[in-house]
From Swiss-Prot:
Feature: compositional bias, Acidic residues: 97-118
Record's subcellular location: Secreted
Protein name in the entry: Osteopontin
Keywords, in A-Z order: Biomineralization, Cell adhesion, Cytokine, Glycoprotein, Phosphoprotein, Secreted, Sialic acid, Signal
Species whose genome carries this gene: Gallus gallus
Residues making up the signal peptide according to the UniProt record: 1-16
Amino acid sequence: MKLAFLCLCFISIAAAWPVSKSRQHAISASSEEKYDPRSHHTHRYHQDHVDSQSQEHLQQTQNDLASLQQTHYSSEENADVPEQPDFPDIPSKSQEAVDDDDDDDNDSNDTDESDEVVTDFPTEAPVTPFNRGDNAGRGDSVAYGFRAKAHVVKASKLRKAARKLIEDDATAEVGDSQLAGLWLPKESREQDSRELAQHQSVENDSRPRFDSPEVGGGDSKASAGVDSRESLASRSAVDTSNQTLESAEDAEDRHSIENNEVTR
């Protein structure tokens, strides 16, 4: 395109060159024949004709150059911009919906106004109350309330099971201590009987014989009774303390369940 543009420029210059020469020749001829009025008139007419032709030629060349420049710019723009394929116009869903609405409106306008029924709508909409739960979680749901209650009951059951284990351990220790208390008097009784037998064998002639086993047995029975009473008292104290702990934990569990139900 640039080469074509340069060629057109050279052509226009070459075309304008003889026009300038003819103008110079006309000027020189007019200066030579200025004294002849008839020749002067013909020369002037010829000069006007040449000037008009040169102006038309220059205007034509300028138009050609402008058209070439426009074609050059348009070709460059077409090369830069990719061609977009022409797709057929598909009516969108919104346009179809608008057309359907227009048809419905036209149909409704065609009907009689006497068939229309006016219904009064309520001005105030019903409002459902919002129950706000506790801050720990979603207390407004029933499932959450049941899960919370199940967690509380499970924790109370675990505490009761642990308390029962502790009570069983305490009762086992008390039973072991009672058995130890029952066995210890027997050993002491045997030891006392042996000592008394030795003492009686040494002093058999000087002192009368006493029934040492009966005496030892009475002492052992008295000590066993005292130990049994102490064990019973300790067991009753443990039972009362366990009962108080159970009642306190049950009260706490009930209070926590009631709080969860109130907040829910």
